[in-house]
Swiss-Prot record:
Family note: Belongs to the bacterial ribosomal protein bL34 family.
Compositionally biased residues, Basic residues: 7-22
This protein's record includes keyword Lipoprotein: no
Designated name of the protein: Large ribosomal subunit protein bL34
C-alpha cells in the first residue's frame, strides 16, 4: 500500500485556496473566522 497523502500544490490550492474559499458563503465565513482569530495563514 502507498501513503494516502500524495501532495500536489495545484490540487491543494484548487480545493483549499483563498479564491475557492471566497466563492461560497461558508468559505467566506471560514476566512472571516480565521481573520478574527488572528491566523497568519488564512488559507492554503
Amino acid at each position: 500500500m502507498k501513503m494516502t497523502f500524495q501532495p500536489k500544490k495545484r490540487q491543494r490550492a484548487k480545493v483549499h485556496g483563498f479564491r475557492q474559499r471566497m466563492k461560497t458563503a461558508g468559505g467566506r465565513k471560514v476566512i472571516a473566522a480565521r481573520r478574527l482569530k488572528g491566523r497568519k495563514k488564512l488559507s492554503a
